[in-house]
A protein has these predicted regions:
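Acidic, polar-rich low-complexity tracts and alpha-helical solenoid repeat scaffolds
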Residues: 1-124
């Protein structure tokens, strides 16, 4: 069960995003991760950090990939993991133009999360 403090710190980071956008939310989310490495929210925190990395101008693809990768590889049972893998697929395909890597992410998504909403995007 997360402590009130931990819950508050996580909420602060998300509120920073709601109020000030991704740019304002990156530092509080990084602080949350640094101070609460074993939090029940940790996989979500890395996921949101990756989303913020994508949402800023200029987009920080390197950090986004790193943080989505942490969710996908270290927290494969997280509810955010399928989305993280899908985002990695999109970045590989659209940004890095690396079809080999994109196909690896697609295969991983279909194999590990066949019932996910993200997997269904490939079945249309």
């Amino acid at each position: 069960e997360p402590s009130e403090l931990e819950k508050a710190a996580y909420t602060v980071a998300l509120d920073a995003y709601k109020q000030g956008g991704a740019k304002k939310a990156i530092a509080p989310m990084q602080n949350f991760i640094k101070n609460n490495p074993n939090s029940v929210y940790i996989s979500n925190a890395y996921f949101w950090l990756a989303e913020f990395n994508l949402a800023i101008e200029p987009t920080n693809y390197a950090e986004a990939k790193k943080n989505y990768g942490i969710v996908a590889n270290q927290y494969p049972n997280s509810s955010r993991a399928p989305r993280a893998v899908y985002q990695l697929y999109n970045i590989a395909k659209e940004v890095d133009k690396n079809s080999t890597q994109a196909n690896q992410y697609k295969a991983k998504l279909l194999k590990q999360y066949p019932k996910s909403e993200e997997a269904s995007f490939f079945k249309k």
